[in-house]
Amino acid sequence: MTEQWTPEKANDWYASIDPIRGCNYLPRSAVNSTEMWQAESFDPDTIAEELAWAGAAGFNAVRVFHQFLVWRSDPAGLKRRIDRFLDIAAGEGIKAMFILFDDCAFAGKEPYLGKQDDPIPYTHNSGWTPSPGLTRVADHSVWPALKDYVLDIVGSFADDDRVQIWDLYNEPGNSELGETSLPLVEAAFAWAREAGAQQPLTTSIFRGHEGYAMEQRILELSDVSSFHHYGDTGVEAVIQRCQAYGRPVLCTEWLRRVVGQTVELILPIFARERIGWYNWGLVAGRTQTYLDWRREFNTPDSKTWQHDIFHADGSPYDEAEIELIRAFAFD
């Protein structure tokens, strides 16, 4: 059992690590977290190739999603695959932030095991499913299994320095769940602390306005504060809101070139405000997150990528971005 970190402990930890230069990561061969982690589609060779590109580009962290159903069907096998992944990442000087729950559901369906749907042409992230699934979030009959999932995964890697941070719940309340997700958020923090996590815990705010009560509670629960931002303006206001809690601040999702939120725009702000970060996406692949969220903007002639850093052959989308990532340091 561990307690919430004090702001002093969190800030001492943050001062002891290098500035986080991270990305949200799935291999190009995976359409979602189920395909990434299932035994039949786990792809360590592609992971090794891509994380080598990441390390060479200056990345030192990855944010990675997990899927409850994969754990439920094969807990021992999943933990072996996690260990393999962490070894590959560590070999490139990269640490992991792991996500256990997620309310994003681009696919419009609940998670499922087995072969995953192929991506829909010209559609951003068409195969993405939530974890544990939108219908399970408020179904307390499932919660004993959800608790076991958190206790097992967090407990198995609770003092593993290859895991840098636990991001317990991605965008709680998304997919029109709203405040329905808050009890599971609170439970996830309690379970992770019961599991004895030695790493800091967080969940990111993503709506970015003061009136959303659940986000205040999330910031109160977190050891380090974190947020998502995809606009070309307004990031400083969200940073200030997080800084009010006196803890380190991370931006765990950003980069939307199609509306002007670029590497060139954002990294100087993060350097000045001492914000560790994880842009969305590394290699263009089956998630198709290089495409715009707005399907009507995606045509064969589309040139500007929304997310992602590398083409599938390892060549960068923009070499100038790589230079900025490599050079990133706090002011």
Label for each model-derived stretch:
Residues 1-222, 228, 233, 245, ...:
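Active-site mouth of glycoside hydrolases
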Residues 235-248:
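A contiguous binding-surface segment within folded domains or other stable secondary-structure elements
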Residues 291-331:
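Extended, alpha-helix-rich binding/interface surfaces that flank or overlap catalytic cores
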